[in-house]
Amino acid sequence: MAKTVKKSGPKKAKRNVPNGVAHIQSTFNNTIVSITDTAGEVISWSSAGASGFKGARKGTPFAAQTAAEAAARRALDQGMRQIEVLVRGPGSGRETAIRALQVAGLEITLIRDVTPLPHNGCRRPKRRRV
């Protein structure tokens, strides 16, 4: 039977990345924040679900704020100072996540909305009758 070899030390090497891009995907059910370098390699990420929220609470602005703070904290540990922010989706945590990134100590140089809009593509789901 093969023996498992135990590795010691940090799992991921710390890199010095001064600027990057924060991708905020905000849906009605969750908010995902990924911070990448300029080449697109993910430095840190977090989501409302990964921050400990479950169910309907994942879609709240407070959950988005918590997720953005967690991702920003890890990015600051990697040496990140300046970020561009790309926001995608219609969720309620968009503005809150951007504000949380700024409060965490990251300098925001650009905010761009990259929500995909169909040019009359697929048929929309039927309306909910509650």
UniProtKB/Swiss-Prot annotation:
Transmembrane segments: none annotated. GO terms for biological process: translation. One of its GO terms (cellular component) is ribonucleoprotein complex. Disulfide bonds: none annotated. This is Small ribosomal subunit protein uS11. Pfam families: Ribosomal_S11. Part of the 30S ribosomal subunit. Interacts with proteins S7 and S18. Binds to IF-3. HAMAP family: Ribosomal_uS11 (MF_01310). The gene is rpsK. Keywords: Ribonucleoprotein, Ribosomal protein, RNA-binding, rRNA-binding. Belongs to the universal ribosomal protein uS11 family. NCBIfam families: PRK05309.1, uS11_bact. GO terms for molecular function: rRNA binding; structural constituent of ribosome. Located on the platform of the 30S subunit, it bridges several disparate RNA helices of the 16S rRNA. Forms part of the Shine-Dalgarno cleft in the 70S ribosome.
